[in-house]
């Protein structure tokens, strides 16, 4: 089992997050906290489409996991007053799977494809005419007698979500009219999300405690809500049910989440480079072997936050741990 599967601070959705995220999900752009640039642009595009009585242009949402791409896809459907059909790149294994989904759509519907970068190229080719001309080309028969039949589709909006925009093929990426990058959240935005989640949980939470959880949530709402859920457990068992600063600090220390939101895996990655490779540079595959995790997981899940806070650098020669990370661990950088 991947160590990411057990990770409290992973931005990836876990099984236990599904019901919680559904209950916490805002229904409108007005209720949605953060992502102001993307939100304001979507407000204009949605309003313009409604005024023209057209479907919204296809939308690509990209950025690190846990920032609200699925939530925004559902909000787009709500704001347009249409239904949303949800699937994912790995779930669409054959062109026929995609054809079945497309032909089931009603006029104006939103089709949300999560992890769209994982679509097979043969499936992408079926998607191109569907996105451009709202039609589906189906090949009937085999060999010399095979013929292509074109089926008309109702106008729809494709919303694609990806953590790896660079992995999308250029022809697919170019067919999206709206591209929105989701950024990490500020501490104040996350604190507001934690307090809103506390209201849904019907748990009293001190404003300082909400800020402390926000500071350690790695700029990610999914992580903030997950941390609050665990801190709430400590508040009920070790306290009087109120999430206080004291309970929060105790809980997060026991959960091995430090003051910058780094956990034992981040420590293992950074200290591994420091202690075994004198801070780098060291290649990604070597780091992968050192901590026992796949290289693409390190690149997509672990490294973005470490790069964001300036603890790690990617260079042509490999990964380098920065002076900031040495300072965080109370260590001196080796002299060259």
Curated annotation (Swiss-Prot):
ATP binds at residues 24-25, 66, 69-71, 132-134, 175, 185, 222. One of its GO terms (molecular function) is ATP binding. Residues 4-185 are annotated as: Large ATPase domain (RuvB-L). The RuvA-RuvB-RuvC complex processes Holliday junction (HJ) DNA during genetic recombination and DNA repair, while the RuvA-RuvB complex plays an important role in the rescue of blocked DNA replication forks via replication fork reversal (RFR). RuvA specifically binds to HJ cruciform DNA, conferring on it an open structure. The RuvB hexamer acts as an ATP-dependent pump, pulling dsDNA into and through the RuvAB complex. RuvB forms 2 homohexamers on either side of HJ DNA bound by 1 or 2 RuvA tetramers; 4 subunits per hexamer contact DNA at a time. Has 3 domains, the large (RuvB-L) and small ATPase (RuvB-S) domains and the C-terminal head (RuvB-H) domain. The head domain binds DNA, while the ATPase domains jointly bind ATP, ADP or are empty depending on the state of the subunit in the translocation cycle. During a single DNA translocation step the structure of each domain remains the same, but their relative positions change. Its EC number is 3.6.4.-. GO terms for cellular component: cytoplasm; Holliday junction resolvase complex. This is Holliday junction branch migration complex subunit RuvB. It catalyses: ATP + H2O = ADP + phosphate + H(+). Keywords: ATP-binding, Cytoplasm, DNA damage, DNA recombination, DNA repair, DNA-binding, Hydrolase, Nucleotide-binding. DNA binds at residues 314, 319. Its main location: cytoplasm. Residues 259-336 are annotated as: Head domain (RuvB-H). Mg(2+) binds at residue 70. It is an enzyme of class 3 (hydrolase). It comes from Bacillus thuringiensis (strain Al Hakam).
């Amino acid at each position: 089992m991947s160590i990411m599967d057990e990770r409290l601070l992973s931005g990836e959705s876990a099984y236990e997050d599904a019901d919680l995220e559904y209950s916490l999900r805002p229904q409108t752009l007005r209720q949605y906290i953060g992502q102001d640039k993307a939100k304001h642009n979507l407000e204009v595009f949605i309003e313009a489409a409604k005024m023209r009585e057209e479907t919204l242009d296809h939308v690509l949402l990209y950025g690190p996991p846990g920032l609200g791409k699925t939530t925004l896809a559902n909000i787009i459907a709500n704001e347009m007053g249409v239904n949303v059909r949800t699937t994912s790149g790995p779930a669409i294994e054959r062109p026929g799977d995609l054809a079945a989904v497309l032909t089931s759509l009603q006029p104006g519907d939103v089709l949300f494809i999560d992890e769209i970068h994982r679509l097979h190229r043969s499936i992408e080719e079926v998607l191109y005419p569907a996105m451009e001309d709202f039609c589906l080309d189906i090949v009937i028969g085999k060999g010399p007698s095979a013929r292509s039949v074109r089926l008309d589709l109702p106008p729809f909006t494709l919303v694609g979500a990806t953590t790896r925009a660079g992995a999308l093929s250029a022809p697919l990426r170019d067919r999206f009219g709206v591209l929105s990058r989701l950024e990490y959240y500020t501490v104040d935005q996350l604190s507001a999300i934690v307090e809103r989640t506390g209201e849904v949980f019907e748990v009293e939470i001190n404003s300082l405690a909400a800020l402390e959880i926000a500071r350690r949530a790695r700029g990610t709402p999914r992580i903030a809500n997950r941390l609050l859920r665990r801190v709430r457990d400590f508040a009920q068992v070790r306290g009087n049910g109120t999430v206080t600063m004291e309970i929060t600090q105790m809980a997060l220390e026991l959960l091995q989440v430090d003051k910058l939101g780094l956990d034992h895996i981040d420590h293992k990655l950074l200290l591994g480079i420091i202690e075994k490779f004198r801070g780098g540079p060291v290649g990604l595959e070597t780091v992968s072997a050192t901590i026992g995790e796949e290289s693409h997981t390190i690149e997509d899940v672990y490294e973005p936050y470490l790069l964001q806070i300036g603890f790690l650098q990617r260079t042509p020669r490999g990964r380098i741990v920065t002076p900031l990370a040495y300072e965080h661990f109370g260590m001196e950088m080796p002299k060259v």
